[in-house]
Swiss-Prot record:
Consists of an N-terminal domain, which is sufficient for the localization to the septal ring and is required for cell division, followed by a linker domain, and a C-terminal domain, which forms the translocation motor involved in chromosome segregation. The C-terminal domain can be further subdivided into alpha, beta and gamma subdomains. The alpha and beta subdomains form the DNA pump, and the gamma subdomain is a regulatory subdomain. This is DNA translocase FtsK. Residues 209-231, 253-262 have a biased composition (Basic and acidic residues). Residues 453-649 form the FtsK domain. The chain crosses the membrane at residues 34-54, 63-83, 99-119, 137-157, 158-178. Its main location: membrane. Residues 179-788 are cytoplasmic. Residues 1-25, 209-244, 253-272 are annotated as: Disordered. Pfam families: FtsK_alpha, FtsK_gamma, FtsK_SpoIIIE. It is a multi-pass membrane protein. The keyword Nucleotide-binding applies. Essential cell division protein that coordinates cell division and chromosome segregation. The N-terminus is involved in assembly of the cell-division machinery. The C-terminus functions as a DNA motor that moves dsDNA in an ATP-dependent manner towards the dif recombination site, which is located within the replication terminus region. Required for activation of the Xer recombinase, allowing activation of chromosome unlinking by recombination. The lineage of its organism: Bacteria, Bacillati, Bacillota, Bacilli, Bacillales.
Length: 788
């Protein structure tokens, strides 16, 4: 029986399992999933207004819920997912919170719409509204929709508009509480704590401000008390009103001021003071006249006592006319650089930079006489050094001889890439001076044209000294000739004087005989050192004149002389500017380096105010020629093409001159400039120089100042030496053009000490140069010298 019962119960269990499985199969109907997917698709179409169906769905929800329809979309999607997977309608706390939030948003949307445009009494039917919305392809603002409209329409008469606002806030708070599972008590507690914290911080800030104000008030009160204490400590001074005869203001005479004169006329009680003031003013005028006469006498005495430039009889030549620009050749028309070719190279440049990962654009192109500058604007984040390192790659891509990169261009957020032109355009001195001729500044000289093609002229008196250096054939001598010719075209002989030193003997001899020269062109290196010392003496004499005349510089002194000549009807000569030009400094430094360096140092340090300006040129820019003393005292420099970056640094302090093209291509650094200016130098032919010199000489002959001429060099043959072999050693060294102690030992079979003494005597008598390490000594006298 027991076994039969067990079998029957087992059969019942299997039958119940079958029934539940069949029910599950019935409940797992796939139609539910299809409906869920369809609802999701329709909601997505409605949210994004996709097609006709999407637009109709969104119009329908807009009509019912207004702006709150987007929450409705979310709630429908969440409810669909919940029903699909849990197979029941959601009856949870979050469901109630979502419904409350939907109602609150209906109120909010309708309230916003109400405050903006007021309540509308009528609504269109749903179908007509949907059709109209689709037909006009727009979705008008319906606030909270039909539901929000009727909710507000029913609530306002019952609890007023203010009550509706309060109910809306409560609904929003309730929905948040239901969704987050927080009780009202907790929310209120957190809100109260936040409010208390805010009020606490506010009170702290206010108390801090009050304390600061209190401290300021106390500080002001303390300062006032200190002021009163100081006033009490000072001796008591009677009030101004107690003095009847003394005016309230001090009667300080201001000469040349009409107000004091009017006061003296209307106040008879001050007759004595006015009389004293008039006497003192007369005394001052008389004292000034006496001082002027004394100054004139001192000037005459200084002129009479010293041998000066004016003593040479330099008279202002009224009939002298500066040479016209027509003496210079008219520049010939040259073929301009093709703009299409330049633009093509700019595009190639951009592509090349892009190939190497540099994002940059060509923003501007400047076509100059010798080079074309491409302004590159790098993108944000691009390092400038990355562009500079592509120097060789850019030159290769553009098929250029060399490329100079200026990174960045001073004063601009751009990088300049200078590419040589296929043909250098000739720049003439006439076209450079044409715009500023004649110049008011007598020392205005023309250099050439810059990268933009603009003419560059610079005043020598603002430089105030100039260093010109470059290798042979780079255009250095042409630049010197252009500077001298510019002075001849601007200044008369009594305005500017020149001293030319040319150890090479061939560059500046053409200027012999012009009236602007102080002395003939100096070609002997020994005389050159003495000539520079004469300039130093002239500088000291001028400063002595400035001291006696109470002037500071040559400009003030000349103005004083002109004023005296007008008042006293005299003809005192004005001081002319002096420009000293040394064409080859290296030769002078080898012969008399110490004397030349000392003279150049004194001239460059002090001669600016005296109207003396120095131009030094050399083709060997080494540190033993351009020493640190010379370099530091000559702020303006011109660098022509050099062979190495070291030479460029010696001249202008930075590299760049080694990349110049030659033929007048230069880098100019002015006084106070932080960057170089690339200039194509102005060309001047020998015939043009000769024409200007002939024009000047025909009007006035040279009147040299004998006192400025250097002394004749000492005859080396007359110098005595204690050694009997000195004359033979002298002739031997001059014939062989080399000298050393061992050579004299072998030639004359003498000991080392005697040979060393002979070498010292030869060096002292300036037959050989000083010793320079392991290098052989230079013989300073050749066989062509008559003294030998």
């Amino acid at each position: 029986m027991a076994q039969a019962k067990k079998k029957s119960t087992a059969k019942k269990k299997t039958a119940s399992k079958k029934r539940t499985n069949s029910r599950k199969k019935k409940n797992d109907n796939p139609i539910r999933y299809v409906i869920a997917i369809l609802v999701v698709v329709l909601m997505v179409l409605g949210v994004f207004q996709l097609g006709i169906i999407g637009r109709l769905i969104d119009s329908f929800f807009n009509y019912l819920f207004g702006y709150s329809r987007y929450l409705t979309y979310i709630l429908v999607l969440l409810a669909t997912g919940f029903i699909t997977y849990s197979k029941r309608i959601p009856k949870t706390r979050r469901t109630a919170g979502s419904i409350v939030l939907q109602i609150a948003l209906l109120f909010v949307s309708q309230l916003v719409f109400h405050f903006n445009s007021g309540i509308k009494a009528e609504r269109e039917p749903v179908l007509s509204y949907v059709y109209q919305s689709y037909q006009h392809s727009h979705f008008p603002n319906f606030g909270g929709g039909v539901l929000g409209f009727y909710l507000l329409e029913l609530s306002v008469p019952l609890i007023s508009l203010f009550g509706v606002c309060i109910i809306t806030i409560l609904l929003l708070c309730s929905s948040v509480i239901l969704l987050t599972n927080h009780q009202h008590r907790d929310v209120a507690k957190v809100a109260l704590e936040n409010i208390k914290a805010w009020f606490g911080s506010f009170n702290e800030k206010m108390s801090e401000r009050n304390q600061e104000k209190q401290l300021k008030r106390e500080e002001k009160a303390r300062l006032k008390e200190e002021q009163k204490a100081r006033q009490n400590e000072q001796p008591q001074i009677k009030d101004v009103s107690d003095f009847t005869e003394v005016p309230q203001e001090r009667d300080i005479p201001i000469y040349g001021h009409t107000e004091n004169e009017s006061k003296s006329q209307c106040q008879p009680s001050r007759k004595k003071r006015v009389f004293d003031a008039e006497n003192s003013s007369n005394n001052i005028v008389n004292h000034q006249a006496d001082q002027q006469e004394q100054l004139t006498e001192q000037t005459h005495n200084s002129v009479e006592s010293e041998n000066t430039i004016e003593e040479a009889g330099e008279v202002t030549n009224v009939s002298y006319v500066v040479p016209p620009l027509t003496l210079l050749n008219q520049p010939a028309k040259q073929k301009a650089t093709s703009k299409a070719e330049v633009q093509r190279k700019g595009q190639v440049l951009e592509n090349t930079l892009k190939d190497f990962g540099v994002n940059a654009k060509v923003t501007q192109i400047k076509i100059g006489p010798a080079v074309t500058q491409y302004e590159i604007q790098p993108a944000q984040g691009v390092k400038v050094s990355k562009i500079v390192n592509l120097h060789n790659d850019i030159a290769l891509a553009l098929a250029a001889k060399d490329v100079r990169i200026e990174a960045p261009i001073p004063g601009r957020s751009a990088v300049g890439i200078e590419v040589p032109n296929e043909k250098i355009s000739l720049v003439s001195l006439k076209e450079v001076l044409d715009e500023k001729f004649p110049s008011n500044n007598k020392l205005e000289v023309g250099l050439g044209r810059d990268i933009s093609g603009d003419p560059i002229t610079v005043p020598l008196n603002e430089m105030p000294h100039l260093l010109v250096a470059g290798s042979t054939g780079s255009g250095k001598s042409v630049c010197i000739n252009g500077i001298i010719t510019s002075i001849l075209l601007n200044a008369k002989p009594h305005e500017v004087k020149l001293m030319l030193i040319d150890p090479k003997m061939v560059e500046l001899n053409v200027y012999n005989g012009i009236p602007h020269l102080l002395i003939p062109v100096v070609t002997n290196p020994h005389k050159a050192a003495q000539a520079l010392e004469k300039i130093v003496a002239e500088m000291e004499r001028r400063y002595d004149l400035f001291q006696h005349s109470s002037t500071r510089n040559i400009k003030g002194y000349n103005e004083l002389i002109r004023k005296q000549n007008q008042e006293l009807d005299e003809k005192q000569p004005e001081l002319p500017y002096i420009v000293v030009i040394v064409d080859e400094l290296a030769d002078l430094m080898m012969v008399a380096g110490k004397e030349v360096e000392n003279a150049i140092q004194r001239i460059t340090q002090m001669a600016r105010a005296a109207g003396i300006h120095l131009i030094v040129a050399t083709q060997r820019p080494s540190v033993d020629v351009i020493t640190g003393i010379i370099k530091n005292n000559i702020p303006s420099r011109i660098a022509f093409a050099v062979s190495s970056q070291t030479d460029s640094r010696t001249i202008i302090g930075t590299g760049g001159a080694e990349k110049l093209l030659g033929k007048g291509d230069m880098l100019y650094v002015g006084n106070g400039d932080s960057s170089q200016t690339r200039i194509q130098g102005a060309f001047l032919s020998d015939q043009e120089v000769q024409d200007v010199v002939n024009y000047v000489v025909e009007q006035q002959q040279a009147n040299y100042v004998k006192e400025m001429e250097p002394d004749a060099p000492v005859d080396k043959s007359e110098m005595k030496s204690e050694d009997a072999l000195y004359d033979e050693a002298y002739l031997f060294v001059v014939e062989q053009q080399k000298a050393s102690t061992s050579l004299l030992q072998r030639q004359f079979r003498i000991g080392y000490n005697r040979a060393s003494r002979l070498m010292d005597d030869l060096e002292r008598n300036q037959v050989i140069g000083p010793q320079k390490g392991s290098k052989p000594r230079q013989v300073l006298i050749d066989l062509n010298n008559d003294e030998v």
